């Protein structure tokens, strides 16, 4: 199996970096092939701009998604974007490691998504959710935060993470492009716990990765329940 891992943390010695390393070591020990985009180490440019396109469909007015589609077909999309797209398309499984920032991904990862998950091969028209461009692939996530488990979930102060604060990522991004979204591994309260507790988390993460095939999937909209205009049937 081919896995492409996207890592977003500016500190090479961070706990999130340790999670990245555990994931790679565990997958490779199972015989899988792993590629990595370490966004800070790469100095990846997260800013979408007109410079992303070598041949403008409309030189007078930038409609970013339409230019993405046009330039992908023409082979004129920026090389740094094209390289990342090829890594994603070549993978069977995508993985993401990051710290939670304001109940979302770090800005550099959000920018990577905006520039790399392009209209055309990833989504477009009725090609979303179960019919999305990456149908048949799957994605998993391991992220760290300072909060405790009791702060999240039904009836908690913040509500659920996967179907609440981070629905924009799990459904609005990963699910939208058609991948099967594995329930995430969450490292809780990381800055405030003991070294032994953090080590146990890394052991738990290794087990999560080893048993990835058995992890539950997050529920996504069933496109068959909607007509061609996405109205409920």
What residue ranges belong to the model's regions?
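Conserved catalytic-site loops of classical short-chain dehydrogenases/reductases
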Residues: 93, 138-140
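N-terminal beta1-alpha1-beta2 submodule of the flavodoxin-like/Rossmannoid cofactor-binding fold
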Residues: 1-98, 103-121, 203-233
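Glycine-rich phosphate/pyrophosphate-binding loop and the adjoining helix
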Residues: 152, 157-233
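Solvent-exposed loop/turn segments at secondary-structure junctions
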Residues: 102-103, 146-148
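Glycine-rich His-Gly loop
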Residues: 8-10, 144, 151
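A gly/proline- and charged-residue-enriched helix-loop-helix capping module
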Residues: 124-128
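Short, conserved loop/helix-junction motifs that constitute active-site signature segments
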Residues: 131-136
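Hydrophobic/aromatic beta-strand patches that form the interior of the parallel beta-sheet core
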Residues: 4-6, 35-37, 140-143, 182-185
